[in-house]
Amino acid sequence: MASLFLSSLVLFLAALILVPQGFAQYHLNPVDEPPVNEPTVNKPPQKETPVYKPPQKKSPWYMPEQKESHLHVYDKHLTAEHNIHI
């Protein structure tokens, strides 16, 4: 009785291991794949046609010049004479 159970267990485990590997590619359709190593085609580089860019004109509205902040001079750190909170 034990040998029948042991042999059926071994047969069942062997079927679990072997059957999925045997039927793995069975239901798949064959796939046409392009060749991996295609020959290289030497084409000359394509030259881009030059694009005409019209000269830039100044805008019609007036914009006053921006004054530089005193923070720019002192590397964005106030000194003691500029600090009004001391």
UniProtKB/Swiss-Prot annotation:
Q: In which tissues is it expressed?
A: Root nodules, stem and flower.
Pull one GO CC term from this UniProt entry: extracellular region
Describe the family membership recorded for this protein in Swiss-Prot or TrEMBL.
Belongs to the plant proline-rich protein superfamily. ENOD12 family.
Question: Where are the stretches annotated Disordered?
Answer: 30-59
Query: What is the annotated localization of this protein?
Result: Secreted, Cell wall
Q: What is the lineage of its organism?
A: Eukaryota, Viridiplantae, Streptophyta, Embryophyta, Tracheophyta
Listed A to Z, the keywords are:
Cell wall, Nodulation, Repeat, Secreted, Signal
Where does the signal peptide begin and end? 1-24
Briefly, what is this protein's role?
Involved in the infection process during the plant-rhizobium interaction.
Does Signal count among this protein's keywords? yes
Annotated spans, 7 X 5 AA approximate tandem repeats of P-P-X-X-X: 34-68
Q: Which GO BP terms, alphabetically? A: nodulation
* Protein name in UniProt: Early nodulin-12B
